């Protein structure tokens, strides 16, 4: 609640300042579209909005005030997530938003769930924030130890129209499989978990940070195995699709379940190429200020995974020119 209230206060302050003719010209409002209020995107967006904001009249960073961009008032706004955020950025109703790297890649290239649509060629990355991990969850005793073992099994690939479904198909193809090799179903993670618990499903794909509640409950009650996504199939996948990256789920992430190597996508902070280069450069500087590091580390578990050394990895789309300038100065890009 503290994050949301702070964002609202910043928004209210911006309104008050805008009423002042002497200060209004110094204000830049910057909207960050996030996700649902119960998810991870929204609180992370609140932290970042606080970090990059420094409204007119505020103390400077050197004087103990915010180390955000002077004149910027940023707000984190709840949304329907990645696809909605891409649309908002493309349409100009949001200056930025959080998007899964696979969704960003498909939008930029008019592929995947965007096949047949115009390319969203204005989409640009500010930073890779943190990983979102692929889980292939199998019912204990189902005899599924590798992806090849999915043949003939009852497997959920996630709901129609989802990015997870498209990614699951890509993963299967990398191992020489298709949906026709199994009894495929198309369910959300919670629905799939319920069916697996009732012995009506053998395995399902899910993308999330770990631990995911639905999977943690299965581990504690029904018993599960995590199936690795590794070896030559994973290597082929990583080589072919730049939005994937190597990932792992450690031992103990789920009670009594051995960790595995897997693949993941990334939560990206994205914007439009039409946003001012100098503004995005200053926002990147503020994002990676040491003061922001403290805010991210203390504000949310996923905040601790937002690190400068991985900011340019697994993007799948071009960086914004302003962000690219910053990362070159930091030696992350040539």
Give the role of each language-model region.
Residues 1-15:
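N-terminal secretory signal peptides and thylakoid transit peptides that target proteins
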Residues 153-170, 242-312:
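Ligand-binding clefts/hinges and TM-proximal coupling segments of bilobed small-molecule sensing domains
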Residues 29-64, 128, 132-198, 293, ...:
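Bilobed "Venus flytrap"/periplasmic-binding protein-like clamshell domains
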Residues 116-129, 252-261:
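A structural signal for short loop-to-beta-strand junctions that line the ligand-binding cleft
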Residues 191, 208-226, 278-334:
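An extracytoplasmic/periplasmic, membrane-proximal ligand-sensing/linker region
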Residues 20-24:
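Sec/Tat signal peptide C-region and signal peptidase I cleavage site
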Residues 62-117, 190-195, 201, 210-219, ...:
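Pocket-flanking alpha-helical
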Residues 101-103, 112, 142, 178-270, ...:
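Pocket-lining segment of extracytoplasmic ligand-binding domains
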């Amino acid at each position: 609640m503290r994050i949301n209230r702070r964002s609202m206060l910043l928004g209210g302050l911006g309104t008050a300042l805008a009423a002042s003719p002497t200060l209004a010209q110094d204000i830049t409002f910057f909207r960050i579209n996030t996700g649902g209020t119960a998810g991870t995107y929204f609180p992370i967006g609140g932290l970042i909005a606080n970090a990059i904001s420094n409204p007119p009249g505020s103390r400077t960073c050197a004087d103990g005030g915010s180390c955000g961009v002077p004149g910027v008032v940023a707000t984190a706004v709840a949304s329907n997530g990645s696809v909605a955020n891409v649309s908002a950025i493309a349409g100009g109703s949001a200056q930025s938003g959080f998007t899964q790297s696979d969704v960003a890649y498909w939008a930029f290239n008019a592929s995947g769930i965007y096949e047949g649509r115009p390319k969203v060629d204005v989409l640009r990355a500010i930073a890779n924030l943190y990983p979102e991990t692929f889980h292939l969850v199998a019912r204990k005793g189902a005899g599924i130890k590798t992806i090849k073992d999915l043949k003939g099994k009852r497997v959920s690939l996630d709901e129609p129209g989802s990015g997870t479904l498209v990614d699951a198909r890509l993963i299967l193809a990398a191992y020489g499989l298709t949906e026709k090799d199994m009894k495929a179903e198309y369910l959300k993670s919670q629905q799939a978990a319920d069916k697996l618990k009732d012995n009506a499903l053998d395995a399902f794909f899910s993308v999330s940070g770990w631990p995911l509640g639905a999977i943690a409950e299965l581990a504690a009650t029904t018993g599960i195995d995590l199936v690795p996504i590794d070896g030559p199939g994973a290597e082929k996948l990583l080589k072919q699709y730049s939005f994937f990256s190597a990932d792992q789920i450690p031992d103990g992430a789920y009670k009594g379940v051995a960790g595995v190597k897997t693949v993941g996508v990334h939560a990206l902070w994205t914007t439009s190429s039409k946003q001012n280069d100098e503004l995005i450069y200053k926002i990147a500087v503020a994002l990676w200020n040491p003061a922001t590091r403290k805010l991210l580390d203390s504000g949310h578990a996923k905040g601790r995974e937002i690190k400068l050394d991985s900011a340019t990895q697994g993007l799948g789309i071009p960086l914004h020119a302003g962000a690219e300038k910053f990362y070159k100065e930091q030696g992350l890009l040539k």
